Amino acid sequence: MNEEKNYKEKLMKMYVKRELPLLKRNEKFNFACVQCGECCRNRDDILLNPFDVFRLRREKKMSLQDFVEKYCEFYTGNTSKLPLMRIQFRPVYELNGFVTGTRCPFLGQTEGLYHCRVHKAKPFVCFSYPLGRIQELGKETEYLLQNDGTCKGAVKAKDEKIMQVVEDWMGGKEKLDREERFNALYSYFLANYRKWINVDKLAENKKAFSIYKKWLALAAELLYANYDFDSDDDGFLEQFKTNIDAIETISETIVEEFASLVDLHPKS
């Protein structure tokens, strides 16, 4: 886990220094997945965004409660103060009963090769690997190529000169268009929810903590649960926008409703 954390910190430093290759959707990069399953083991950082949760729940045909209990960890972000979800990896046992590591609950194996049991509904961070996404306000989305130097697929691709096109690797034009539309909506929400309500004060003020728990539950419902699971991905995007608007309305209502108890107006 420490190695993974150190690698993430190294990536961030490299990005800030502009030392990571940045790619546009029509550009090529070296990579070839060899189905070794290494990137699906010993991790605690596979966060699920609302679009990921929608597709996985639709694929598994599960309620949010059942999905979380079986596959995920639901927690509150220390900094964001938002309800967040990540995949709960499962322990791997040796014959002697000792735990030797962890693995993704969706990792399968056939004839020595590893595969994802929910391939059609893979979370973004999984199907996009080894690419990460960078989207600055008002600018075209770019993708950074991350490689820790030990990935067998990256080594094979470099040795054999195997190339991928960003757009094709990410599932094609239509899928990537939807991903970028979702990311724009989600980025808007993340950039603005603190402008609707002082969520930091809400979470830290003892008088307001019960109100925060109520807001947190409503936000979780609207971000992850309040969808028609018979709809397609485009339908999800429409519902997601409606749900973001609802969080804004609820937040502003709470600010006014409890004004006599605590000032929850956004920081100026």
Region roles according to the model:
Residues 1-268:
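Short loop/turn segments that flank or connect secondary-structure elements
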